[in-house]
Amino acid sequence: LLIAPCMPLRGAGELPNILFILADDLGYGDVGCYNPESKIPTPNLDRLAAQGILFTDAHSPSTVCTPTRYSVLTGRMAFRTGMRGVFTGAGGPCMIEKGRLTLGGMLQGRGYETALFGKWHVGMTFFDKQGKAINKNGLEAVRRIDYSRAIPDAPIHRGFDHFFGSVCCPTTDWLYAFIDGDRIPVPPTGIIDRGPLPKHAYSRDNRPGMIAPGYSMEEIDLQFLDKSLAFLDAHAKKKQKAPFFLFHSTQA
């Protein structure tokens, strides 16, 4: 259903732009169009739903981040990852092997400009100073990363022209730094101080990893949003425009 609008019937007009929002940890009953008694007002989503399609009998083969994203990006069943959990820290390599067609890559083939802003979470390969792939979780793995090296299986090598985001969950996993394209322009320099973070039931979900200067836990989703809005603004100003596919991937 997501791809159908991109394949116009013979004689149809221009290819449509596509905005795909992956709302991590959004419950079925959290949106007003599905649950009038929802505690969170969602007027914009409700308006979109009124003009589109409501899925009332949809089922997920996986309820966690990594397998879900793998399925969305590849069109394959989540069980094919062989992984029921999620990547953390410098975990990798990318589950989407080189040469596998992705949603972004397919749309690139149709002339789309493709962008992904937000959480990737299907693995990336980081290297140490000797050029050895790390592909492990934990603080020591993050400490070993050589940040001068490019990431060979970042999203820009898997079907996306633009990427800004995080390798894993940006507020709970060991590597608290942003990736721009296939590099980390501002590497982490110290251990995260969890003291100033808001106190709630999941306060200790933040693993004691390495954090980059200026990396604000409270502003993560807003930074992803700024990148998506800037991409849309830049696209609107172009005189010669290809259609765009924007994958906005929120954090958990």
Where are these regions (language model features)?
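Bacterial N-terminal signal peptides
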Residues: 1-5
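Formylglycine-dependent sulfatase
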Residues: 7-252
